Amino acid sequence: MVKIGVCGPVGSGKTALIEALTRHMSKDYDMAVITNDIYTKEDAEFMCKNSVMPRDRIIGVETGGCPHTAIREDASMNLEAVEEMHGRFPNLELLLIESGGDNLSATFNPELADFTIFVIDVAEGDKIPRKGGPGITRSDLLVINKIDLAPYVGADLKVMERDSKKMRGEKPFIFTNIRAKEGLDDVIAWIKRNALLED
């Protein structure tokens, strides 16, 4: 089972990305989802209502505190959810774990996630990639979402591209508009090639 952690700031499009991935990949792969919220199970409920995934393949973890603590320093609640999900579905191939909304320093405990996708959106401004932080510099894949909003918020995608290359070196990044499925195929291709080790 490959575990992919998806993290990023509130509203960046983490849940939308996970929903889109399950919609396009669950027919070919045995998948499940774990979501994290501080005080609610709102993201899990959204997934249950909008995803093609059956309800028993989605677990919502209510962290009750700092979102990055639940995925890094004390990942015990999430590790229990992973164990529970693996018990339900022993042949699970791909488990997507969504962090609660967090800042640019969010990273997953290596026991919890084999790969990390960090999601930002252009509405935060084109300076976000150059601000760095472990989410930007260390994630296996950086997704820059909501590119359709760039003209409305004064974000320059060329600046974001330049700064992402500078901050990430050889590590990949993908521009997306998840709602319109733009860039989604590239994210799926990255998962298949890097996480699932397909050609």
Swiss-Prot record:
Name of the protein this chain belongs to: Urease accessory protein UreG
NCBIfam families assigned to the protein according to its UniProt record, in alphabetical order: ureG
Residues involved in GTP binding: 8-15
Organism the protein comes from: Helicobacter pylori (strain Shi470)
InterPro entries in UniProt: CobW/HypB/UreG_nucleotide-bd, P-loop_NTPase, UreG
Entries under SUPFAM superfamilies matching the protein: P-loop containing nucleoside triphosphate hydrolases
Family matches, as PANTHER family: UREASE ACCESSORY PROTEIN G (PTHR31715:SF0)
Record text on subunit structure and interactions: Homodimer. UreH, UreF and UreG form a complex that acts as a GTP-hydrolysis-dependent molecular chaperone, activating the urease apoprotein by helping to assemble the nickel containing metallocenter of UreC. The UreE protein probably delivers the nickel.
GO cellular component, one term: cytoplasm
UniProtKB keywords: Chaperone, Cytoplasm, GTP-binding, Nickel insertion, Nucleotide-binding
Main location: cytoplasm
Function: Facilitates the functional incorporation of the urease nickel metallocenter. This process requires GTP hydrolysis, probably effectuated by UreG.
UniProt record similarity statement: Belongs to the SIMIBI class G3E GTPase family. UreG subfamily.
Compartments reported by the entry: Cytoplasm
GO terms for biological process, alphabetical: urea catabolic process
Lineage top rank: taxon: Bacteria
Gene Ontology MF, one: nickel cation binding
Pfam families: cobW
